Amino acid sequence: LAGRTAVLKLLPFSHYEMEKGEILPSSVNEEVFKGAYPRIYDKAINPNDYYPFYIQTYVERDVRLLRNIGDLSKFIKYLKLCAGRIGQLLNLSSLANECGISVTAATNWLSILEASYICYLLKPDYNNYAKRLVKTPKLYFYDTGLACSLLDIQNAEQITTHFLRG
């Protein structure tokens, strides 16, 4: 019994939490652009200043701790391609092909993104349990601000006309 511990999973703020904390951005586009990492709201940091350093630190430190990735530039490309596929059915073969990596590597890299709470897979909802297990999930990011940064979106106004909006 000695050494028991509690594990907390701290995700970005929810819309409800931002509303109750009175830090909700003035528009939906602004909320999507800024994302929901507490640091941005706590220190009033510009997302364009925060996310590039977050990505750099994440890739250089956290990813290397989780798995030895030889070519970090390919991993960053993979991360950006994942951001471009938010809300779409997961196609690891396509991701692997576009990055020039094996499907096994793409699968392993996705597990890194899931383990570090960057991405999650939304499983399909079917009454038939077997269908839920075999149907293709959709890919999502926990934080929209991070995804915007990876997609080189520079301000909330760009979201209005961005080809991935929806």
Name what the model sees in each region:
Residues 12-27:
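Conserved small helical "lid"/interfacial subdomain of P-loop NTPases
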Residues 28-56:
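Conserved AAA+ ATPase small/helical "lid" subdomain
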Residues 1-16:
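A short helix-turn-beta junction within AAA+ P-loop NTPase domains corresponding to the substrate/partner-engaging
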Residues 7, 21, 29-30, 130-131, ...:
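Short secondary-structure boundary/capping segments
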Residues 45-166:
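Accessory nucleic acid-recognition modules appended to NTPase machines
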Residues 5, 37, 89:
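Gly/Ser/Thr-rich beta-alpha loop segments that engage phosphate groups in nucleotides
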Residues 1-4, 25-26, 139:
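Short, hinge-like loop/turn segments at secondary-structure boundaries
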